[in-house]
């Protein structure tokens, strides 16, 4: 199934964090926090301003982004756990 977000929404796939610390300690699932980093999988066309013009989003498909701990709505699409959030929930793009 193809999913196209509307307006200024984006679809993000979480990037899983390491299961081991640098010292070699394995972190159990119960102690892990959900990662706050992800990859943009789909973007909407942008938000409309008062004149009805569409303002394109600053992020694009493939960007690695950081977002807040409670940002977005969790959904499952084609068996993948994804987040749908507004562009304003994204704190920044991680430089490659």
UniProtKB/Swiss-Prot annotation:
Coiled coil: none annotated. It comes from the Bacteria. Pfam families: Cpn10 (PF00166). It is found in: Cytoplasm. GO terms for cellular component: cytoplasm. InterPro entries: Chaperonin_GroES (IPR020818), Chaperonin_GroES_sf (IPR037124), Chaprnonin_Cpn10_CS (IPR018369), GroES-like_sf (IPR011032). Its main location: cytoplasm. GO terms for biological process: chaperone cofactor-dependent protein refolding. The keyword Zinc-finger does not apply. Keywords: Chaperone, Cytoplasm. GO terms for molecular function: ATP binding; metal ion binding; protein folding chaperone; protein-folding chaperone binding; unfolded protein binding. Heptamer of 7 subunits arranged in a ring. Interacts with the chaperonin GroEL. Together with the chaperonin GroEL, plays an essential role in assisting protein folding. The GroEL-GroES system forms a nano-cage that allows encapsulation of the non-native substrate proteins and provides a physical environment optimized to promote and accelerate protein folding. GroES binds to the apical surface of the GroEL ring, thereby capping the opening of the GroEL channel. Belongs to the GroES chaperonin family. This is Co-chaperonin GroES. It comes from Methylorubrum populi (strain ATCC BAA-705 / NCIMB 13946 / BJ001).
């Amino acid at each position: 199934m193809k999913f196209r977000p509307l307006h200024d929404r984006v679809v993000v796939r979480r990037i899983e964090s390491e299961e081991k610390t640098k010292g070699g300690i394995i972190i159990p699932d119960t102690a892990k926090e959900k990662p706050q980093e992800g990859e943009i999988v789909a973007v909407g066309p942008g938000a409309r301003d008062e004149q009805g013009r569409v303002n394109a989003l600053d992020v694009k498909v493939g960007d690695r982004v950081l977002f807040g701990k409670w940002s977005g709505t969790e959904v499952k699409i084609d068996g993948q756990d994804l987040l749908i959030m507004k562009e304003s929930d994204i704190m920044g793009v991680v430089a490659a």
